[in-house]
Structures are given as structure tokens and as C-alpha cells.
Amino acid sequence: MVTLAMVTYLDRACIGTMKTTIQAEFGLTEGEFSWVFFSFILAYAMFEIPTARWAEQRGTKNVFSRIVAWWSVFTLVTAASWNYLSLVVTRFLFGAGEAGAFPCMARVMSRWIPFKERGTAKGIFFAGAYASGAITAVVVTALLPFFSWRTILVMFGLVGFVWVIAWHRWYRDDPAQHPAVNRAELDEILADRPPEVAHPRGWAFWSNLLRQRNVRLLCLLYMPNCATFYFCITWLPSYLQNQHGFEKAALGWIASLPLFASIGTQFFGGYISDVLTRKFGVIVGRRTPGIIGYACAAVFIVLASTARDPVMAAVFIALAASTCMLTTAPAWSTCVDIGRENSGTVSAAMNTSGQIAAIAAQPIIGYSLDWFHDWNTPFWFLAGLFVMGALCWAFVDPTKPVMAPAGKVVRTGGTMSSDVAL
């Protein structure tokens, strides 16, 4: 799963570092290029929940293989873009494939990871993703003097097909069916797994899901997380180069600083969530990193907006991003805690709302630069989101499943059902 996270971020993060090169080739303004970023995030938001439900109904193994192959194809197709419109369309189709990656991951972890280790496992997963995102900027910066941006995309696209082959040969949807899993390991996986939950079918399922306060809070609190990540991989290189004059030789490393700093906090956020859960219960374990992480991020991003020294501005942005990412593993662990066998759909709903915030940020940033030449706008936008996220974390209750406990009868459009399977 860590290698999947790395492939995912490799393919999506590279476009930000290539941005100025692609802009020069197609003659695009900042506002126009914002729609390239927008198209990816829009598709990601549109297809995340449908893909999650598809995986819950058809099995994660096959769905995962198909979506990784899909986005790898469109990474290659992006390299063949011949004008602005083709670039926007191919990034949209690429985003449609990547949309299901993390909800599928949540479902895999709900089946394979013991309850007491969920936070740590999520932290390791996202640490790997951010390591890939950070290294991508450095690698692309190093390759651009020798290869065209198109050739680099072809290289990255081929990596996904290697992963699909390995995944399809190794993975099983049920750990009990895997020949390498022994009885002791299976008992550990199943030991603390919460009971399955009964749920209605069809529209009643969605109506019940969206009425849950926990789901609505998760949707709101994940917005700053996604908006921050996309700012780092899309606009940050331009900010550092245009606002503070960093040269291209140093740009890759400086632009990667927030993601490098986030590697440790991604892991630590998950680890400390598990430690606090074992000592004080799951409510304290999930809430604490979320509240502290966002509160610190709000302070650091405001300091970044006021910094005049280029190095200090970069450091404050890195601190804001890294403390923000303390919240990632607890958020995804909470999705599994309350979603159970529907964890893919719950995490998809949360992540989709995050993409909506990131979608809104793209034209806000792009056109504010074109019209006002003002880089403070994204920083204050993020600061407001961080405050909102911290407040939402204070009310999340990971002990309450989104559906009724197993065996409880639920009404589904005039009929009664206690089915658990979809």
C-alpha cells in the first residue's frame, strides 16, 4: 500500500513542478493554468464516491487494478497533449482514475489492519505518499534539463503498470484466503474488529449517511488538509520562484520542504493517535492530533504571510503544512472506525469534500494573482480553513458507527431489512 501511495503522488505531483515549462510551451497565464489543476481535482471529487461503492460491491482487488491502470494510461496520454484543451481534458480523465485510490486503501486497511494499529498504518501510508510527493519535485527538477516534460510523464506512467502486475498477483480481499497469512496473524487482525453494521439499500443508504453528524464534520475538517496539499504541489513552486526569487537549481528542494517535513508528522499523527487511543480511548486518540495540528498550522500560515525573508517564508509554510498533516491519519482512521464495512464510502465522502475545497482554491489563487498580484490571499484562505477544521475536530465522535449495529432492523423504503452485504 505504501508503494501505491508513492505511485499516486508521483503521477499527480509532477505537473506542479513542470508548470512553468508547460506554460511556456502553450503560452498560458496563471489563471488559464489554474484550470489544468482544477480539472484534475474536479474529476477526483466527482468519481471518488462512485469508485468507493464500486470497490465495496465488486471487491477491492479488481477495482484497484483497473483504476491504477486507467490513470497510468492517462499519465501517458497527458504527455501527448497538443494544446490547452487537450491538456485540461487529459488531466480530468487522469483524475477520474486516481479518485478511487485512497477510499480503496481505507477498505483494504479495514480488512487487513488490526484496530489497535490503524492510526500507525495510516500514518505510514501517508508518510510514503508525501515522501514520493517531496522526491518528485526534486527528481523532476533534476530531469528537466535532460528530458522534455513529455518524456518524464511517460517514465512516470510506466511505473503504475509495474505496480498493477505486482498487486494483482499478491493481494486477496480476504486475509484468510492469502497463503502467507497464518492463524495467529488472522486472529490478531480479527481480534478487535468492531461488529458489522446493518444498513438500508439504495437512496435510504445515502440519506442515512448524509444525516450523520460525524460524516458532515469529517467532510468539513478534511477541507484544509486537501487545500494545503494541493497548494504545495501546484502553486508553491511558482510562489517561491516569482515572489521570493528562488533559482531553479534550489527550487526543487525548497518547494519539497513542506512535503519532506510532513513525512514525519504523517507518521507521528497516526502513531500518537494509537498511543492516546490505548491510554485514554478512541475519542481522545482521534481528536487530539486533529485539534493541535490545525491550531498550529493556522499560526504558522499567518506567520508565512507576514514573512519578508525568503527562507523564513519557506520555513513557515513547511511548518504549517507539516502540522496540518498531523490530522491525516486520525481522519482516515476515524472513517474506518465509524464506517466499518462502508469505510470506503465514508472516506470517499470526506475526501471528496476536501477536493471541493481544493477546487475552489484553484481559480481563487490563479485569478487573484492575475488581477491583484497578491500572494497573501491563499495564506489567509488556508488560515480560515485551519480554524474551521480545529473546531470540527472537537465534536467528532469515533465511537458512533454511521449505520445501525448488526442485527438491528432498519426500514428501507417501506420494507424491513437487516442485511449487511450490499
Segments from the language model and where they lie:
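Extracellular/periplasmic helix-loop-helix junction of adjacent transmembrane segments
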Residues: G16-M46
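Central cavity-lining transmembrane alpha-helices of secondary-active solute carriers
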Residues: F38-R53, S256-G269
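Helix-loop-helix hairpin linking two adjacent transmembrane segments in secondary transporters
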Residues: F125, A129-Y171, P175-H178
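Cytoplasmic helix-loop-helix junction between adjacent transmembrane helices
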Residues: T90-A127
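Helix-breaking motifs and short loop linkers at transmembrane-helix boundaries and internal kinks
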Residues: G27, G59, A80-S86, G97, ...
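Conserved MFS/SLC helix-loop-helix module at the cytosolic interface between two early adjacent transmembrane helices
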Residues: M46-L85
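Extracytoplasmic gate region of multi-pass secondary transporters
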Residues: I15-G16, L210-G269, M325-T328, W332, ...
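Structural signature of the two symmetry-related core transmembrane helices
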Residues: N62-V77, V284-V302
